From Swiss-Prot:
Annotated protein name in UniProt: UPF0328 protein ECU05_1640/ECU11_0090
Family: Belongs to the UPF0328 family.
Species lineage: Eukaryota, Fungi, Fungi incertae sedis, Microsporidia, Unikaryonidae
Organism: Encephalitozoon cuniculi (strain GB-M1)
Entry superkingdom: Eukaryota
Length: 268
């Protein structure tokens, strides 16, 4: 039979029904877009709370899913055997924990960043659609069991998964070229999720249970590399936001950023 048992394969994914699996990413990407459309870009500049609630759901989704993957990985019964499997196992868990940490820190830092011009658009529309597809695929389409790590979708779910993986790049290119596509990133990813949910509801598919083929491993590695790239950029934005905030509050003068001992002492 070409399916993993629940103990072998689904322990590294959320134990929810397909509908509930698809609901969090749909809400997490639709809510920031809705906030942006309701309030407009000018309301974000001096409103940290509005920035906070805009990014809370997508970044919380990212943090929760990565922490869940780490939790299930550490609590599974079949630990890795061999040096290579152990190295890949601990490296993968370290990366997932790093992604979760960056997401949590971004929730704290982004609201204090100064959003000017189109920053509110990029943070509410582009940013969620940029990192959420890889999180979604790691949670629903990848096996993280040592020795079986790889992409597990079969049938029509394979092109759907590939479309989800590529939609951040496609959306970003279209948005940069034509302004009429400015809402496409908030539409394309949810549409693909809905297509997948409808397909799973009507025609449930099995997961690959054969030894992991090279192309499946390659897709998983690509998803992981894409995640590393995305969260590296997010970490950079976090550092810049933190530096700018400290420059305005602690290291501030009228001419240039300098050390303010009185403000440092007030923080102790």
């Amino acid at each position: 039979m070409n399916t993993f048992s629940p103990q072998q394969h689904t322990e590294n994914r959320l134990r929810w029904s397909p509908a509930l699996k698809g609901l969090p990413p749909l809400v997490s990407i639709a809510f920031p877009a809705l906030i942006y459309l309701i309030f407009g870009k000018d309301r974000f500049e001096e409103n940290p709370f509005l920035k906070f609630i805009t990014l809370l759901l997508p970044l919380s989704y990212s943090a929760a899913h990565h922490l869940f993957l780490v939790h299930t990985s550490w609590n599974r019964s079949n630990k890795p055997e061999g040096i290579l499997h152990s190295i890949s196992y601990y490296t993968l868990n370290l990366l997932l924990l790093t992604f979760a940490t960056i997401s949590i820190l971004s929730i704290i830092a982004f609201p204090f960043d100064e959003w000017e011009g189109d920053d509110s658009y990029y943070c509410s529309i582009i940013l969620p659609s940029f990192f959420m597809p890889s999180v979604y695929l790691l949670s629903t389409s990848c096996c993280l069991v040592p020795g079986r790590i790889g992409f597990t979708d079969t049938g029509i779910n394979v092109p759907i998964g590939m479309s989800i993986l590529l939609c951040p790049a496609v959306s970003f290119v279209l948005v940069c070229k034509e302004s009429e596509y400015h809402l496409l990133p908030a539409i394309l990813f949810p549409i693909l999720i809905l297509i997948r949910l409808f397909k799973e509801k009507c025609f449930p598919s099995e997961k690959n249970a054969l030894p992991t083929a090279p192309w499946r491993t390659a897709i998983f590695v690509f998803i992981l590399i894409l995640s590393i790239f995305i969260y590296t950029l997010m970490a950079r934005v976090f550092v810049i936001s933190l530096y700018d905030y400290l420059s305005r509050t602690v290291f501030y003068s009228n001419t240039a950023p300098v050390l303010r001992p009185d403000r440092i002492l007030s923080l102790l």
